[in-house]
């Protein structure tokens, strides 16, 4: 695996293992665990990071790479960090194990949210951090929200 792929896999595994299960109640989700992981992952890039949400345990993270033209349109990379409840009987592996296994077409990460949508949330975070650390400046603002 190349470095960016490896970072994506590790971040995805961490997000899965945090068990941010949203059952539709205000007390569920605990997305702050994943927002904190993303804050740490994007930290040290010089980006302004903001965390907010309706309750202390239901936080989201926003980061922005400022564009060079304030009149240019912005682009938002948006994901979510919660998952729906699990019926353990329907799983052959631990749904919160984040296991990296050999699949038919190569390595696969198994776990709740691995394909909806923690995979995209983690890959966008890795790409966003890579752009930020290489000095990339888009014409319009580039925003990461999860």
In which residue ranges do the predicted regions lie?
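Active-site metal-coordination/substrate-binding segment of hydrolases
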Residues: 71-143
């Amino acid at each position: 695996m190349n470095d960016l792929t490896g970072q994506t896999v590790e971040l995805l595994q961490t997000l899965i293992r945090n068990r941010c299960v949203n059952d539709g109640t205000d007390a569920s989700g605990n997305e702050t665990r994943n927002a904190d992981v993303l804050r740490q992952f994007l930290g040290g890039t010089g980006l302004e990071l903001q965390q907010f949400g309706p309750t202390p345990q239901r936080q989201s993270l926003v980061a922005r790479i400022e564009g060079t033209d304030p009149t240019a349109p912005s682009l938002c990379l948006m994901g979510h960090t919660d998952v729906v409840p699990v019926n353990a009987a329907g799983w052959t592996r631990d749904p919160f194990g984040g296991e990296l296994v050999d699949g038919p077409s190569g390595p696969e990460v198994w776990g709740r949210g691995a394909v909806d949508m923690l995979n995209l949330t983690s890959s966008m975070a890795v790409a966003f951090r890579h752009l930020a650390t290489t000095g990339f400046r888009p014409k319009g603002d580039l925003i990461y929200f999860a």
